[in-house]
Amino acid sequence: MVLSQMDAGKALTAAAARGNTSMVQRILEESRVHPDTPNEFSMTALQVMMMGNSKIASLLLEKGADPNVQDKHGIAPVHDAARTGFLDTLQVLVEYGASVNIPDKNGALPIHIAIREGHRDVVEFLAPRSNLKHTNISGQTAIDVARALCVPDMIDLLFAHIHS
């Protein structure tokens, strides 16, 4: 498979978006494309990958993908993993250096998003690693988001981490 860098970038992002692990691996190995090569929409494979496929995340990160790459809205893969609730993918991203304290353009950290989406296991993972005093553009901390959404179990979980 001989592809130009641009074509290889398109093929890589398409395979990652479809969750095609074997094709992602093949493109990375045979075309020697850098995993951060963007597609025609300026998105990398890590940004468009099927979040439920932690194996693809591992392949891309092992080959040097930037775990903190952000789109024009400040959304990083950790925000997407927190939003969709894929803890295994989030763990891989963090293992490879993704920051859990990277804000999007609204100032939301991944923990704010996980609380909003109701992903308790993700919140449990993020709480000891996150800056729980960080406020979004509305001035809300993670606990404030949980209070606004009336989720007492998340409020308790966050208080436990603050007072530990």
Features from the language model and the residues they span:
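Eukaryotic tandem repeat interaction scaffolds
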Residues: 67, 71-91, 95-96
